[in-house]
Amino acid sequence: MKPSLQLKLGQQLAMTPQLQQAIRLLQLSTLELQQEIQEALESNPLLDVEEAYEENATADVHSINEEKEASAEVLDIEPQDSSDLIEKSEISSELEIDTTWDDVYSANTGSTGIALDDDMPVYQGETTQTLQDYLLWQLDLTPFSDTDRSIALALIDAIDDYGYLTVSLDDILESFADENIELDEIEAVRKRVQQFDPLGVASVNLQDCLLLQLATYPASTPWLEEAKQLLIQHIDLLGNRDYKLIIKETKLKEEDLREVLQLIQQLDPRPGNNISTEHAEYVVPDVSVYKDHGKWVVTINPDSVPKLKINQQYAALGKGNSADSNYIRSNLQEAKWLIKSLESRNETLLKVAKCIVEHQRDFFEYGEEAMKPMVLNDVALAVEMHESTISRVTTQKYMHTPRGIFELKYFFSSHVSTDSGGECSSTAIRALIKKLVAAENTAKPLSDSKIADLLADQGIQVARRTIAKYRESLGIAPSSQRKRLL
């Protein structure tokens, strides 16, 4: 076959730079889009921010400063004693028996009270330093001999995120084989490290951690000795919630055991968790939903991103054929493309958000249990867009509603068939499971099979394994772990 050149006339789809930019902006989150716009403002002199947006931002800054000054004045006039603050941060004595240690100890609860000095490292959920960093900082402030300091460093290095040692003391002793160090000396240093904040770090097990915390309580604390004996002799039964056997073994009355458990629940089984190593993630709602005269209204959040305009003074300099004029015209075209892409993004986002609100109207009226099943294709057909476009516009985009802030993808869920031939959203089923568990008899918690039967009575057929999966996604423990002491 002889090679030759041929001309062929045809049509094909081509993605223009403008379309590429519009698609890229569509999938950016609000914070990413703000950064993109800021970079464009810095690189393109033809772009400006509209004055109304700047005035709003300035007003917000002034408002924040005024609030800070007012707060400072209140603090100056009404100083509060640190002991009062500590008392306010103490755990309520009305906690239910089944409350777990993780539920009792929140991120802002510490073993040494509240740090009031701004220069002091604050670990109550506000710092991003690691647990090891915080312990090393305290080590530098504590007098140790060179040998003991080396041992303390080895201990701190072996502590996991929960605050427990990951190696045995014998293993640490072996690491000092070349030095004349005894196991008793390592244990003595460990005891000193355990007094660091948060109290209980460097413990070898849960029993060691909890007993150390109990040792700091005043001797006059009610039920203190009973709590210590329960942890020493029956911690396994306590973990299994075998209250009947505990009563039999300890000879405690049911009311007395209740008091002992309430004391133990004030302890922190994972002291290292008080150190937060994760940065807080902030979201800015892209759209707002509110009810006005009985109708649900959807609007774009005007403060989510700056509103751009063309700098007309620079644009007027684009006439002519000089290099400067060509530069102005090039940037002018890019500025127009960006503004048009942002307008297109807002139009698409608003259209999709309105469709979601219309489809999930019952959710906004009645809550999660009224959520309807909905997939991306349902919205794509309604707004006459491709499913991939709907996926982009609902990813990392947030809606502010009277019920809270939700990612747009939250409103999409699979469906489960009902006996009546209808469909029920998996989100609604999760809400029903949460409601059933909240109302269950705590002496005899509902098993997954029983929950499936109760849903079947409502015409919703769900397999036991599906119930277990939904329950775990809600962070609800199995029935064996939800049992409480009456």
UniProtKB/Swiss-Prot annotation:
Motif position, RPON box: 463-471
Gene Ontology, cellular component aspect: DNA-directed RNA polymerase complex
Alphabetized InterPro entries for the sequence: RNA_pol_sigma_54, RNA_pol_sigma_54_core-bd, RNA_pol_sigma_54_DNA-bd, RpoN_core-bd_sf
Coiled coil: none
Signal peptide positions on this chain: none
Gene Ontology biological process terms, A to Z: DNA-templated transcription initiation
Keyword Glycoprotein listed: no
Pfam families: Sigma54_AID, Sigma54_CBD, Sigma54_DBD
Top-level taxon of the source organism: Bacteria
Keyword tags: DNA-binding, DNA-directed RNA polymerase, Nucleotidyltransferase, Sigma factor, Transcription, Transcription regulation, Transferase
Gene3D superfamilies xrefs: Homeodomain-like, RNA polymerase sigma-54 factor, core-binding domain
GO terms for MF: DNA binding; DNA-binding transcription activator activity; nucleotidyltransferase activity; sigma factor activity
DNA-binding region: 375-394
Family membership: Belongs to the sigma-54 factor family.
Function: Sigma factors are initiation factors that promote the attachment of RNA polymerase to specific initiation sites and are then released.
Protein's name according to its UniProt entry: RNA polymerase sigma-54 factor
Organism: Vibrio anguillarum (Listonella anguillarum)
